[in-house]
Amino acid sequence: MTRDSSLSGVFSRNWIFIRGVPAIRFLPPEGPPEIAFAGRSNVGKSSLINALVQQKGLARTSNTPGRTQELNYFIPDGFSGQRGDLPPFAVVDMPGYGFAAAPKNLVDAWTNLIFSYLRGRSTLKRVYLLIDSRHGIKNNDEDVLALLDKAAVSYQIVLTKSDKIKSNALEKLIMITQTKLLKHPAAYPEILATSSEKAYGLEELRAAILQTIA
């Protein structure tokens, strides 16, 4: 299967979960390009991934902040995984951060796993950092921005739940966020506004992903 044909309708294919990675030694061998999604707990990360590939229940959603503490790998189904028949890319759902009253050892383990992955994964093409439109960039997000800058990984801000605020407030938030990103050398300048519930901004996000892995 050629790369161009594998990208045709990739977001409409059936997607499957292939692996949870609790520690860096469990990472799959480097293969296709990887796109990672990061964000605070309950930012709507799982819902956005599910909406992106039009498949409810692929990435598990939870009302319990910090439930998932692994790197979860998803790929489109129908590829053998052998040389010449790799999926066009993999989606990596990173653990949520910023949950209240987290034990220090859990935070340290999360930080070590994430930084090791970011710094050492040559197939990682971009991290999409999700920010809740109702709250903007918070202190925990700033810490992750610094981590991404330190790892020198390309990342892009995706605003979630943008249907929950008025259009003028969203425009103001985008301007404020763009100004903040001027201090972050690894940040991609364009900000994407999305809503999983209303399917808003999903086509723009899909296009951005395909452009990133092209």
Swiss-Prot record:
Binding site for GTP: 39-46, 66-70, 93-96, 160-163, 194-196
Keyword field contains Cell division: yes
Cofactor(s) recorded in Swiss-Prot or TrEMBL: Mg(2+)
Entry-linked CDD domains: YihA_EngB
Annotated binding of Mg(2+), by residue: S46, T68
InterPro entries for this protein: G_ENGB_dom, GTP-bd, GTP-bd_ribosome_bio_YsxC, P-loop_NTPase
GO BP annotations, alphabetical order: division septum assembly
GO cellular component: cytosol
Chain ranges of the EngB-type G domain: 31-214
GO molecular function, one term: GTP binding
PROSITE patterns named in the record: G_ENGB
Keyword Manganese: no
Keywords: Cell cycle, Cell division, GTP-binding, Magnesium, Metal-binding, Nucleotide-binding, Septation
Function: Necessary for normal cell division and for the maintenance of normal septation.
Family: Belongs to the TRAFAC class TrmE-Era-EngA-EngB-Septin-like GTPase superfamily. EngB GTPase family.
Protein name from the UniProt record: Probable GTP-binding protein EngB
Gene: engB
